[in-house]
């Protein structure tokens, strides 16, 4: 039987696929390639290009493949300030609804959902735990919270079992440098610092007040991928639905990120510029992942800032144009 990974051509999803295949799992990937890259899909995975909102397409995948469980990474990006917020909400919610309906039709009752720490909003009491009440502020957090609630309602209605993983800032890349972060217009601090080091950006935009004075918990994408695989094992054992935070419990400032990047890259001066976003954000955000470590057996292996930036730099320097270079070679 196979694990279906929706969004398996995206950043975190592709790393989860590699981890599954390294563990000898059979994997099926579904991705619309709206933000993902076919070049990121492991060659041993069965790949279907299409949108999970397309019921006919999704049913064909379930007809063709013997699906045991699903990992859900697919998401339509939701800009913080955009007139597309409502349509992006609709795309994400409809995708989840269609996926759950087809899973139910084909008697697939296990799903791991890649959620986000953004569901917590701006909590006053730190560190946050899974018992902290979600109060999302940004559209990204709001839609993730609504999708989480859809899973909870599906469990009540017909017994679906789920694991929701609330991840903090994903970063780094596969140690092989075969896959990494390429989102076109990057919004993640570490990627933008490294793109500045490569000369692709004149300087690093540091958002005020969020990144300028705040501290953030950055989690290596390989550790996130491992947690999603452990969540599949949890469900295979017939255990109850769970929600887990995925964090290291150690936060870094933008200045620390830039200094570490200068050390790793050997480039002595990476210029930064403060940018006023006008968006209310938590200055410092810390969380506990003790529950995931205890119940899933999650043991992060890449949790040093230098290791994170080293792997990210290896990817960016080997692939300065992202997956675009692969398309040129294949063309």
Predicted feature residues:
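Short, solvent-exposed loop/turn segments at secondary-structure boundaries
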Residues: 83-85, 139, 178-182, 203, ...
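C-terminal substrate-binding subdomain of Rossmann-fold SDR/epimerase-dehydratase oxidoreductases
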Residues: 198-331
């Amino acid at each position: 039987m196979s694990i279906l990974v929706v969004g398996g051509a995206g950043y975190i999803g592709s790393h989860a696929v590699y981890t599954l295949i390294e563990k000898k799992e059979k994997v099926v990937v579904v991705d619309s390639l709206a933000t993902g890259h076919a070049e990121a899909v492991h060659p041993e995975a069965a790949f279907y290009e299409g949108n999970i909102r397309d019921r006919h397409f999704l049913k064909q995948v379930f007809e063709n493949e013997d699906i045991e469980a699903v990992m859900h990474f697919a998401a339509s990006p939701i800009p913080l300030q955009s007139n597309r917020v409502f349509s992006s909400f609709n795309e994400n919610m409809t995708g989840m609804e269609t996926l759950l309906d087809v899973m139910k039709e084909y008697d697939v009752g296990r799903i791991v959902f890649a959620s986000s720490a953004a569901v917590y909003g701006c909590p006053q009491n730190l560190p946050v735990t899974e018992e902290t009440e979600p109060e999302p502020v940004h559209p990204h957090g709001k839609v993730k919270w609504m999708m989480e609630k859809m899973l909870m309602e599906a469990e009540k209605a017909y017994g679906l079992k789920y694991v929701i993983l609330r991840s903090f800032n994903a970063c780094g890349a596969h140690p092989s440098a075969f896959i990494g972060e390429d989102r076109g217009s990057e919004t993640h601090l570490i990627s933008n610092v490294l793109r500045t080091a490569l000369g692709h950006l004149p300087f690093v935009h540091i958002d005020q007040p969020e990144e300028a004075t705040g501290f953030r918990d950055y989690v290596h994408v390989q550790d996130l991928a491992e947690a999603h695989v452990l969540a599949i094992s949890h469900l295979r054992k017939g255990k109850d639905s769970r929600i887990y935070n995925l964090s290291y419990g150690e936060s870094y400032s933008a200045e620390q990120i830039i200094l570490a990047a200068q050390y790793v890259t050997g480039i002595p001066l990476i210029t930064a510029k403060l940018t006023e976003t006008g968006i209310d954000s938590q200055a410092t955000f810390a969380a506990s992942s003790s529950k995931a470590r205890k119940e899933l057996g999650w043991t992060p292996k890449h949790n040093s800032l230098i290791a994170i930036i080293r792997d990210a730099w290896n990817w960016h320097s080997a692939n300065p144009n992202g997956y675009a270079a692969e398309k040129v070679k294949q063309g």
